[in-house]
Swiss-Prot record:
Source organism, top-level taxon: Bacteria
Gene disruption phenotype: No visible phenotype when deleted singly or as the relBE4 operon.
Entry similarity comment: Belongs to the RelE toxin family.
Protein name according to UniProt: Toxin RelE4
InterPro entries: RelE/ParE_toxin (IPR007712), RelE/ParE_toxin_dom_sf (IPR035093), TA_system_RelE-like_toxin (IPR051803)
Keyword Cytoplasm in annotation: no
Metal-binding recorded as keyword: no
PANTHER family attached to this UniProt entry: PLASMID STABILIZATION SYSTEM PROTEIN, TOXIN PARE1-RELATED
Source organism of this protein record: Caulobacter vibrioides (strain ATCC 19089 / CIP 103742 / CB 15) (Caulobacter crescentus)
Gene name of the record: relE4
Function in brief: Toxic component of a type II toxin-antitoxin (TA) system. Its toxic effect is neutralized by coexpression with cognate antitoxin RelB4 but no other ParD or RelB antitoxin.
Length: 107
Protein backbone atom coordinates (compact mmCIF):
# COMPACT_ATOMS: atom_id res chain seq x y z
CA UNK A 1 0.00 0.00 0.00
CA UNK A 2 1.40 3.39 -0.96
CA UNK A 3 2.01 5.80 1.81
CA UNK A 4 1.01 9.46 1.51
CA UNK A 5 4.13 11.47 2.23
CA UNK A 6 2.34 14.76 1.67
CA UNK A 7 3.69 17.84 0.06
CA UNK A 8 5.83 20.52 1.56
CA UNK A 9 3.97 23.71 2.31
CA UNK A 10 4.77 26.45 -0.14
CA UNK A 11 7.38 28.88 1.05
CA UNK A 12 5.44 31.75 2.55
CA UNK A 13 8.46 33.98 3.11
CA UNK A 14 8.12 37.34 1.43
CA UNK A 15 10.97 38.33 -0.82
CA UNK A 16 11.81 42.03 -0.80
CA UNK A 17 12.30 43.49 -4.24
CA UNK A 18 13.51 47.07 -4.46
CA UNK A 19 13.08 49.34 -7.43
CA UNK A 20 16.48 50.08 -8.96
CA UNK A 21 16.86 53.63 -10.26
CA UNK A 22 19.85 54.84 -12.29
CA UNK A 23 20.49 58.58 -11.98
CA UNK A 24 21.38 60.64 -15.03
CA UNK A 25 24.89 60.92 -13.67
CA UNK A 26 25.24 57.13 -13.34
CA UNK A 27 23.97 56.63 -16.89
CA UNK A 28 26.39 59.29 -18.16
CA UNK A 29 29.20 57.44 -16.36
CA UNK A 30 28.25 54.16 -18.06
CA UNK A 31 28.09 55.80 -21.49
CA UNK A 32 31.46 57.51 -20.96
CA UNK A 33 33.15 54.28 -19.83
CA UNK A 34 31.63 52.22 -22.65
CA UNK A 35 32.45 54.95 -25.19
CA UNK A 36 36.06 55.08 -24.05
CA UNK A 37 36.47 51.32 -24.36
CA UNK A 38 34.76 51.32 -27.78
CA UNK A 39 37.13 54.04 -28.98
CA UNK A 40 40.02 51.73 -28.15
CA UNK A 41 38.71 49.41 -30.90
CA UNK A 42 37.11 47.09 -28.38
CA UNK A 43 33.35 47.39 -29.03
CA UNK A 44 32.56 43.81 -28.00
CA UNK A 45 34.36 44.28 -24.67
CA UNK A 46 32.44 47.54 -24.19
CA UNK A 47 29.11 45.77 -24.77
CA UNK A 48 30.01 43.01 -22.30
CA UNK A 49 31.04 45.58 -19.71
CA UNK A 50 27.78 47.52 -20.13
CA UNK A 51 25.78 44.30 -19.68
CA UNK A 52 27.73 43.42 -16.54
CA UNK A 53 27.23 46.90 -15.06
CA UNK A 54 23.48 46.81 -15.69
CA UNK A 55 23.17 43.21 -14.47
CA UNK A 56 24.95 44.11 -11.24
CA UNK A 57 22.64 47.07 -10.77
CA UNK A 58 19.58 44.91 -11.38
CA UNK A 59 20.80 42.33 -8.85
CA UNK A 60 20.56 44.99 -6.15
CA UNK A 61 16.76 44.75 -6.44
CA UNK A 62 16.77 41.55 -4.39
CA UNK A 63 19.99 42.05 -2.41
CA UNK A 64 20.29 45.81 -1.84
CA UNK A 65 22.53 45.55 1.22
CA UNK A 66 25.07 43.36 -0.56
CA UNK A 67 27.47 46.21 -1.28
CA UNK A 68 29.89 47.43 1.36
CA UNK A 69 29.10 50.56 3.33
CA UNK A 70 31.07 53.51 2.02
CA UNK A 71 31.00 57.21 2.86
CA UNK A 72 28.04 59.47 3.59
CA UNK A 73 25.53 56.62 3.81
CA UNK A 74 26.45 55.25 0.41
CA UNK A 75 27.19 51.70 -0.50
CA UNK A 76 29.37 50.38 -3.26
CA UNK A 77 29.73 47.14 -5.10
CA UNK A 78 32.28 46.02 -7.65
CA UNK A 79 30.43 45.18 -10.86
CA UNK A 80 33.50 43.99 -12.69
CA UNK A 81 36.94 44.99 -11.54
CA UNK A 82 37.84 47.82 -11.47
CA UNK A 83 34.35 49.36 -11.95
CA UNK A 84 32.30 50.20 -8.87
CA UNK A 85 28.62 51.09 -8.59
CA UNK A 86 27.98 53.67 -5.85
CA UNK A 87 24.41 53.69 -4.54
CA UNK A 88 22.04 54.49 -1.70
CA UNK A 89 19.09 52.59 -0.34
CA UNK A 90 16.19 55.03 -0.06
CA UNK A 91 13.06 53.38 1.29
CA UNK A 92 12.13 50.65 -1.17
CA UNK A 93 14.43 52.00 -3.88
CA UNK A 94 18.08 51.49 -4.74
CA UNK A 95 19.40 54.68 -6.31
CA UNK A 96 22.60 54.18 -8.29
CA UNK A 97 24.35 57.54 -8.19
CA UNK A 98 27.57 56.88 -10.06
CA UNK A 99 29.79 54.32 -11.71
CA UNK A 100 33.48 54.80 -11.09
CA UNK A 101 36.80 53.24 -11.94
CA UNK A 102 38.10 51.91 -8.62
CA UNK A 103 41.34 53.87 -8.94
CA UNK A 104 39.57 57.23 -9.27
CA UNK A 105 39.27 59.45 -6.26
CA UNK A 106 35.70 59.65 -4.96
CA UNK A 107 33.90 62.93 -5.48
Amino acid sequence: MAQDVGHAAPDTATIFVAQVVWTQRAMADVYAIVGHISEQSRPLAAQRLAKRLFDTGASLATYPERGRVSTQGRREIVAISPYVLRYRIVGDRVVIGSVRHGARRPI
